[in-house]
Amino acid sequence: MVQYLGLNIVSVAARKGSKNLSKFVDKYNVRSSYDSWSNMIKNENLDAIIIALAGIKRLKIKKSAEILKSDEFMPAAGQGIIVVQSLKKNKIINKILSNLEITNVRHQATAERATLKILEGNCNSSIATLSSIENNTLTLSARIYSAHGKYMIEASNDGPISQSIKIGENVGKQLIKKGAQKILESCS
């Protein structure tokens, strides 16, 4: 739970709880269902919960007060990307799946995952990434937050989409030079 301007706010993910929270004094993470979150708001004197927009839409929640902008509140690597895995030997399924693939999304996911790999990050790491493609140029930004949001480092890189792995690795290396390992170790 975090306290901000006298409000008690719960985040359901470590990355969400760490982001932009240097002004908050305390927090805790909750992994449970929307019903549990709703009950927590009612029963534990909580004022708000930070949850993903996908969850709000899926659950058809109409009470959301604000949708946070992705450049202010960066998502986790690969957030919102649907991945389907199949066996190499299953040629029929692979042909069907190849028709569904969006090439730009693959390049974005590849760059974001390359950053995570360099940082040895996972879904519990307080690492955020945001990528975009315009005119065949991939731009990737990433941030790492300390456990309570007191510290944040960021890096970005861009280049041709064909270099998505290199772009992601460059961002990861920039973050390491800025102290990423120390921040990530303090969060675990």
PLM feature spans:
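Short beta-strand-centered segments that line the small-molecule binding cleft or hinge
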Residues: 1
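Small-molecule-sensing regulatory modules
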Residues: 5, 18-188
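Short, well-ordered beta-strand elements
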Residues: 7-13
